[in-house]
Amino acid sequence: ALPAGHQEWTKWDSEVIGGNYNGHLGKGLSCKIQSTSGGVNHEILNKVKLPFSTPATLYRNSPLPSSSLALLTGIVENHAPEPVAWINQNSSGGKVFYTSLGHVEDFKKPAFNQLLKNGINWCIDQ
């Protein structure tokens, strides 16, 4: 139930973060993370050593809205690739960096931590 005085915002995912969440593949699958062709030269991926793997659950986010640019994709054997990191500029002009990664094991990987640092710096124009 929604809190009193609040309405449901069914398009929040697409309108604010530029996503399209529609479930996940489940736990226990190994996921390979690599750059997309459109994101390979983006500054957020500077010094991010790719590919890397994660035990994280792969979220289904395809297709992303046209305002979003996928930077990284996750690949699980026998499943379609899914975007796992992207940028978006929402309708109010806000710059968004999003990643569905964040399993506790991801934080042990220098590549993931560099991705987060770069994404934050990009959002604040540093």
Walk through the language-model features, giving the residues of each.
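An acidic, glycine-rich "communication" segment
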Residues: 1-79
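A residue-identity detector for tryptophan
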Residues: 9-12, 86, 122
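Hydrophobic/aromatic beta-strand elements that line small-molecule binding cavities or substrate pockets
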Residues: 59-60, 84-88
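Extracellular ligand-binding/catalytic regions of CAZymes and related secreted enzymes
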Residues: 16, 77-81, 89-126
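A broad, low-specificity signal marking well-ordered, structured residues that form hydrophobic/aromatic
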Residues: 68-70, 84, 96-97
